[in-house]
């Protein structure tokens, strides 16, 4: 059995929070991409999309690409895209790649 990813989606007013648990990689990134598309295609879309990655322990470049694609799509629909919480490994990944200032609060 390969890595798993669970996503809990909570809509509260005009804000949506995705809480992710597991790993984001080549095998699981399509699941995240699909969920981001569903959330951002809502009418009206949320004004703020918050991702909680506190329980994500691994992310490869595929996962990074999905986050950047989601951020770009969010900007297209006037939605603020933020990663609110990260695990230490993901915080380090964001620091190394320069995404910390772009994606986190």
Positions of PLM-derived features:
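Amphipathic alpha-helical interaction surfaces in cytosolic regulatory modules
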Residues: 23-103
